[in-house]
């Protein structure tokens, strides 16, 4: 079985297909072209996911599920991006839209949390129970793993660093 991971960023949408050994077997990218309606961006995410699957020499029938890492405050239970400044999303129903477009089970998480979990499962933090990951892209984010689980805080903004004041009025 194969899995698709999508990195939804303020500049680019990147998709990767991995196998059960966490090996990336296909990729595809496109520009995000913000600001645009959530429906248009989801259509592009679905297209890029299908392109990555095709580039891997596979079909969507071989894909078990799709995981999306998105900037900002993400509610993984409701599968909604509550707020993402660089996408201009406010309570965007990304999970529901992507499920309709792809027919696959959708998982969604803050991008930095997803990166932190990926590092804990298959990357630099593999074998640890606690780790911190800082992401730098269109924005700045952070993900924390405590006891092998993602820490996201009570409001899903757990370790988001993008709005940390360094210089007052700066």
Q: Language-model segments: which ranges?
A:
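Conserved phosphate-binding loops in N-terminal lobes of ATP-dependent enzymes
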Residues: 4-8, 12-70
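Glycine/GP-enriched mid-protein hinge/lid loop-to-helix segment characteristic of carbohydrate kinases
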Residues: 2, 16-18, 26-29, 37-40, ...
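Short glycine-rich anion-binding loops that position phosphate/pyrophosphate groups of nucleotides
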Residues: 11, 71-74, 137-139
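Glycine-rich phosphate-binding loop and adjoining helix at the ATP-binding site
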Residues: 34, 38-46, 50, 62-66, ...
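Glycine-rich, phosphate-binding/catalytic loops in enzymes
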Residues: 22, 83-87, 150
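A generic "binding-loop/recognition-motif" signal
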Residues: 11, 112-113, 157
């Amino acid at each position: 079985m194969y899995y698709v991971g999508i990195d939804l960023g303020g500049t680019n949408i990147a998709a990767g297909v991995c196998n059960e050994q966490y090996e990336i077997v296909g990729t595809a990218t496109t520009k995000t072209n913000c600001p645009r309606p959530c429906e248009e961006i989801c259509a592009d995410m679905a297209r890029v996911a299908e392109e990555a699957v095709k580039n891997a020499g596979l079909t969507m029938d071989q894909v078990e599920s799709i995981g999306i890492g998105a900037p900002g405050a993400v509610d993984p239970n409701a599968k909604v991006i509550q707020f993402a400044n660089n996408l201009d999303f406010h309570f965007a129903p990304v999970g529901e839209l992507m499920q309709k477009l792809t027919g696959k089970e959708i998982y969604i998480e803050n991008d930095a949390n997803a990166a932190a979990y990926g590092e804990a499962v298959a990357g630099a933090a593999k074998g640890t129970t606690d780790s911190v990951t800082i992401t730098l892209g269109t924005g700045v984010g952070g993900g924390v793993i405590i006891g092998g689980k993602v820490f996201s805080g009570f409001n899903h903004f757990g370790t988001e660093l993008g709005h940390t004041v360094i210089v007052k009025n700066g």
